């Protein structure tokens, strides 16, 4: 089944993050987003019949994400360490996006 609307909504989040960040940074409001890759969820579970083994095999980190992975990013963005991060969409996917062009075989 095509996922055009899902893909469009993801792209909208990326763009909205940049636009809001540019507008709100003047008021000292920082806007950033997290783009999670494969994490256990109802949506992903339904797509793979709750068998994440194939996703884990294809992921450079050999696993799906955990709540702690997202929590670490949230803590970073909410702390002084993230105080200079503005308008970023941080991908948390175990390296899938960054290594995709190297795995075209």
Where are these regions (language model features)?
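A glycine/serine/threonine-rich, flexible loop-to-helix segment
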Residues: 26, 36-59, 69, 99-105
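Alpha-helical segment proximal to the catalytic Tyr-Lys
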Residues: 22-26, 83
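Short C-terminal tail/terminal secondary-structure segment
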Residues: 75, 86-105
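Conserved catalytic loop/helix region of short-chain dehydrogenase/reductase
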Residues: 1-5, 28
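Active-site helix of classical SDR
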Residues: 9, 17
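Conserved loop-to-helix N-cap of the C-terminal "lid" that shapes the substrate pocket in Rossmann-like
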Residues: 33, 63-71
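Conserved SDR Rossmann-fold cofactor-binding beta-strand/turn motif
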Residues: 30-40, 78, 91-93
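Alpha-helical substrate-binding/gating segment
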Residues: 71-82
